[in-house]
Amino acid sequence: MTTSDRLVALVRDTSSALPEDVLKAIAAARRRERRGSSAAAVLDTVLENCALARAKGVPLCQDTGTLTFFVDRALRGRVTPALIRRAVARATALGYLRRNCIDPVDGRSYDDNCAEGAPVIHYVDPGDVPGLPPRGVALIMKGGGSENMSRQYSLPDAGLGAGRDLAGVKACILDAVKRALGYGCAPGILGVAVGGDRATGFETAKAQLLRPLDEKPRAGDARERALAKLEREVLREANALGIGPMGLGGATTLLGVKIAARPRVPASFFVTVAYMCWACRRRVITL
C-alpha cells in the first residue's frame, strides 16, 4: 500500500469509525441514563448509527468537518502538503467525505475539499502533540456544530466573577458548557488550553482532543496533578448540570475533559475551550 493509499484509508477510517475509547464512554453514558428517557433514546440512536457507519464504511455524520492533520516533521519530505491534498481529494471522490469546503468570499464550493488552508496541516515534533508517535500522522475531523461552540476567554472576566487562577479557569470552562447546551451535539468532549496566546490557545486546545478518554491518570509534579484535578472537577460539575445528550436532559453532558497549560505573557491570561461533539473522530497511523 502506498503512502497515498494509507492516507486515504486514514480519512475513510476516521470518518466512519469512532475510536474504541469514545465508543466505550458513550456506552457507559447510556447505562447511566434512565430507561425510556430522552437521553437513553438519543444515546441508543448514536450507538446504532456508529455501528452502521463502521459496518458500511460510510461517514458516521453528514458533517465530515474540518480536517486537521498533525504530521511528524521528520516525514515532511514524504508526506507533503500536496500528497495530503491529493489523498483528501480521492477520499472525497470515493464518498468518504462530504463536499464540505466553501469559499467565504464568493460562496463557491471546493468540490474536492482542497484549497489554500484546507485541509489544515501541522508539521510538529511528536512530543508536542498528545499521542503522536515518531513517524506518525494524526487526523481530527471536527464538525461545524461543535466548532461553533468553541470559545476563548480572557481573564479576569468580571461577568463571570473569574480571576486569574484555576478557579477562574473552571468558571470559564463551565460557562462554555452552559452556553453550548445541546447545540454542539452533546455529550461533548472538551480540549482546553490555559495560557498561550489567542492562536496557540486554539491549536493547543484542539490537540488535546487526541488524548484518549481512558488514558491513565496523570502523575508528575504538582502542576500536572493540579490540571488532572481540574479535569475531574469540570467533568463532575458539568455532568451535574443536567443538560444531557442533545440538551434534552440527563446525566451525561460531557464524556471527557482534557486540559493543557502553556506559558503566557503578564498582560494576557487566555482560557480556550475546543468543544468536540460525541462524534470525536480522530485516528493516528504510523508510516
Task: Give residue spans per PLM region.
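Non-transmembrane, aqueous-exposed alpha-helical and coiled segments at domain scale
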Residues: 1-192, 197-287
